Amino acid sequence: FDDDTIPGSKWFENCLDTMEEKEGIMGTAGVILDDKYYVRHQRAGWPTQNAKVTEVDLVGHAWFFKRDWLQYLWREKPPTWRNGEDMHFSYSAQKYGGIKTYCPPHPTEFRELHGSIMGNELGIDDKATSNNNETSHQQFFTERDFCVQEALRKGWQTVRGVKL
């Protein structure tokens, strides 16, 4: 869990139910890349909603996965230690384990199923990695672009078939 993530009371149940339907890495903030640049993406889950399970390229804020899959996070050295662990995990799990990444349903009318119910309130202070004074937004997104491009170069298959 990110430090700004408070899940709904049925988030874990939602993840378990989703695992029965589509086994994979689960998370509350799903990202579907449209391009080799991270900023060009669509969202599923927080802060938007999705009525059905959605396959995504990476997830953040609250991961849910089988313990055995943690081995994939360190299978390769990540391109940076400052940023991008979310995409590195999804890329590595896909490459070495054939594991996909999903965002469980986040229906508008059932917030207790959501993976983050206070993200807007808790995730906008100067302590947030994407907002802090040590890392500019430009540097943060440049690093994320680099992470996307490194994974693509190494064979990451994105939902929309993004290429370098």
Regions found by a protein language model. Give the residues of each.
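Active-site acidic Asp-centered loop
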Residues: 1-3
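Conserved catalytic core of nucleotide-sugar-dependent glycosyltransferases
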Residues: 5-78
